[in-house]
Amino acid sequence: MTYLGSGGPAGSLTDYYPSWLDNLADNVTIEGSAMDGVAQGAEAVRTILVAIRTLYESQKFNFVGPVGGNGLLEDYTAQVRGEPISCFVLITSNPAGQAQHIVANYRPRSSLLLLSRLVGEKLTGTPYREHFAAGES
């Protein structure tokens, strides 16, 4: 896996792809500040992450690097409907090297609430909808 960088010229992350997305454990879990509760299973996690990524107008990784013996930390910024959003993601792997647990912490609050509502709208009709904010009335 190629990673490590600060986003600067010497450690550019412009071509970084989070390869852990292609290596999810069957019972992987995801939780975070834009969600209520925890979603479990590769299909659930993949569906949620695809929904989130389709809402990003841009995404710039500032840092990607190992944490402990089985973790990976990503720090990135993006835009959702013109609003800036930043995120720290901690990915913990199982002994087989598969992503086992994902925690995402978004900021600022106004942007994370917007993201949560938009993800909820995208996931309407799925069992994962309940984890995200309700749309505006």
Residue ranges and their predicted role:
Residues M1-S137:
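C-terminal and inter-domain tail/linker signature
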